[in-house]
Amino acid sequence: MQIIIRDYQKEDCSAILEIINDAILNSTALYDYNERSLASQEEIFVEKLQKGFPVLVAEQNARIVGFGYFSEFRFREAYKFTAEHSVYAHKDHIGKGIGKALLTELIERASQQKLHTLIGVIDSENTNSIDFHKKFGFEEVGFIKESGYKFDRWLHSVFMQKMLK
């Protein structure tokens, strides 16, 4: 089945909210504790778009099956050529090429925007995501012990980086 990657539209947000809230409640993909509201998620995306960052949607059979974006890595001016990205697939579509299609397009958009490097911050237990990023040329460049606390345990963050050409 064909995967269509396109720019986010406001009416996509409720489908995206289902994906992100599932990740919040059932995984360490996000270090949030509480589900997001539709209004708060819309606000997050509006802010990214207003700053010129892409928010992308993966669609298959007219259904949203994933999304991704990049935005500031840090808020100091000297970091303006570095972005942090995130990619999420619906739990029923993991391992089916959704993340690959999204990350491929995000890397292309980052290059078009003349970014120098992309950063991914991944929970250390998420070895599938770490291996996935390595396939795209990301390298492990940092490890922060006990940087988060969720599900009654300390979590460690792996920083992965891809230099763009």
Q: Where does each model-flagged region fall?
A:
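Conserved catalytic-core motifs of GNAT/GCN5-like acyltransferases
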Residues: 72, 77, 119-122, 134, ...
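Conserved beta-strand-loop-alpha-helix junction that forms the acyl-donor binding cleft
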Residues: 94, 120-130
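A short beta-loop-alpha structural element at the N-terminal edge
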Residues: 3-18
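Conserved acetyl-CoA-binding loop-helix of GNAT-fold acetyltransferases
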Residues: 95-108, 131-135
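Conserved GNAT-fold acetyl-CoA-binding loop/helix
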Residues: 17-46
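Conserved GNAT acetyl-CoA-binding A-motif
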Residues: 110-122
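Acetyl-CoA-dependent GNAT
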Residues: 7, 36-92, 103-104, 163-164
